[in-house]
Amino acid sequence: VLALRAGWSWVIDRFRWLGAEVLRRIRSFSGGNRVPPGPIKHVFVLVLENRSFDHMLGFADISGRDARTGHPTHVDDLTRGGPHANPNPNAADRPVDASRPAVFSLAQKRADGTHPPDPGHEFDHVLLQLCGYTRDQSAKVVLPTHPDPGDDYPGIDNSGFIASYMGLANRDGVVSNTTDPESIMRCFDPAQVPVLTALAKEFAVCDRWFSSVPGPTWPNRFFFHAASSGGLDDSPSGFQSATASLLDGYHFENGTIYDRLEGSRYDWKVFMGDEFPQVFAIRGMTARRLEGHFRRFEEFAEAVNDPEFSVPYVFIEPSYGQVLPTTSKDFTGGNSQHPLDDITNGERLVKQVYETIRNSPHWNESLLLVTYDEHGGFFDHVAPPRTASPGDSISSPENNHHGFGFRQLGVRVPAIAISPLIPKNTVDHTTYDHSSLLATVESLFGLEPLTRRDAAANKLDHLLSLATPRTDAPTSLPEPADSGIVRDQVGLAEESSEDGSLTAIQRAFLHVAFLRHYRETPLFRKPAAIRAFQRIEFRSQANGFMQEVHRRMSSARLRVAAKRKSKRTSGGRRA
C-alpha cells in the first residue's frame, strides 16, 4: 500500500510539474503575468500567532473616524463599558478583571522558577472559553456540550477563559490551583506594543475581525488560503495511515487563492521566515516551491525595493521558532508572537515589513494587512457572531473531530489595514473573518470566490477611499519595547530530561517537515520514508528528524544560491 501510495504521489507530482511548465510557456506567448486593473497593484499579508484583540489592543484607547459614516467613534476595547471580567472557579465571589500589563513571554520564569502554561486554543478549549461552565446541585463542574451535527453552538458569553486556563477543558472536573488565573486576563499596555499601536492609530484598525474557526492555528490559517479548512476543526491528526493528506498535504474541493491567481495569470509569492512555513501543509505547495513562488524572508526587502517588482499577492509567514526543541519549552526564538515567545520579536518583524513597503517604489499602489490566525486562549470581551458555512466537502474525514458545521466564528483578533489610500486614524466596525482577505483580493483582481464563506464575507475595499495617496504616512515606526528577556529566561538554555509525546500542533509542524523531505526523496525510498515518519512518537525523535530536514534544505538552498551567483557572474563577463 505504501509503495502504491508513494508511486501515485510521484506521478501526481510529475503531472503537476508538467502542467506548471506548460502554463509558463503559454504565459510567455501571451505576454506574461497580468497586472491588477485598479489602483492597488500589490496586496501584502502578514499573519502572526495566537493573540486576541483585547490582549494586544484592549487598552490602546483609540478614537478616530468611523470607516462607514465618517463620524467620530471609538474602538470597542476595554477602556469603555464593562466590567470586563471572568469568574474564578476557585473563588466564585471574586471575578478577575482584565488588567495590564501582560508579560512579554509566557515562557519567562516566575519567581518560583516555573513557567506559566501555554493557554489552550484547541476546539474544546475555545468551546469552554466562549460558553463558560455551570455547576450542578452537588457543585460539580458541568462543561458545555459539543455542537450537534447541525452546528447548534451553545450560547456565548465569553466567560470561560479562566476556567479553560485552569484546566477545566480537560473534562475531568479538576480545577488546578497551580495556575495564576490572572495571567489569561492580562493585556498589553500600549507602551509594550508601540509598533502595533502606532499602525492602529495611523491607518485602519478593524475591531470586529474574528478568527474563522473557534479553534487552533491550522484550520484558521487554511481559511486565509482557501476560505475553508476542508472540514478540519482542530489540530491535525491521522498521520498513522498513508492518507492523501499525509503524502500530498491538505486539499480543498475548490482549490486555494493561489489556484485562482494562477488561473487568471497573476503571480504570487510566499516569503517564509523559516524552513517549515505552515502553507507547505497544502497540497502542491512543495512542488510550487520549485516554480519560484517561495523565497526566504531575508530576500523580502531586496525584492520589494526592486523597481521591477510586479507580484500582485504576497503572503508572509513568520518564523515559528523552536517548534520541537530538546528543551521542555517550544516556539521560542521566532517572531510569530506565539505566547511562549518574546512578543517584541514580532513587533520588530511588523516594523520591518511596514518600513520596507513604505519606503519602496511600490508604496502608493500597495495594501498591507497585519492580523493574527487565532486568539491563543487569551481573553476577549466581544462575543463572535454566526457566519456562512463554506459549503464545500470534507476533504479529510479523519480530521473532522467534532462534527462542526463552520457556522460559528472564533474569537476576535487584531487586524490593521495599511495603505496610503486609507485615511489616517480610521476605525472600522465592520464584521470580518479571514475569508474577508480573500474576498478583498477577489474583488481587487476580478477573481471568483472559492466558497460560500468568502462569497458572503465583507471586503476591505471601502477602506481605500482616498482619491490620491497620502504623503504623511510615517516612513519609520517606533522601536519595539525592551522586554528585558535574555536567553536563559525563556527556557532555551536548560536541557530537559523529559522526552514527552508530541502535541497535536507539534505533529502538524512535523508533517510540514515530512512533506518537504518526502518531495526530495527518490521514488524507491519513499515507502521507507513514510514508515520512518510514522514511527516518530517523542520530541527527541521529532527534533532529530526536523534538524536533519532543516540541514538538507539549507544545503540545497546554498547550492541554488551559488548557481545563481555563478550565472550572474558569468553573464557579466559575457557582457
Question: Could you tell me what each predicted segment is?
Answer:
Residues 2, 8-575:
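N-terminal pro-sequences and low-complexity stem/linker regions of secreted or lumenal proteins
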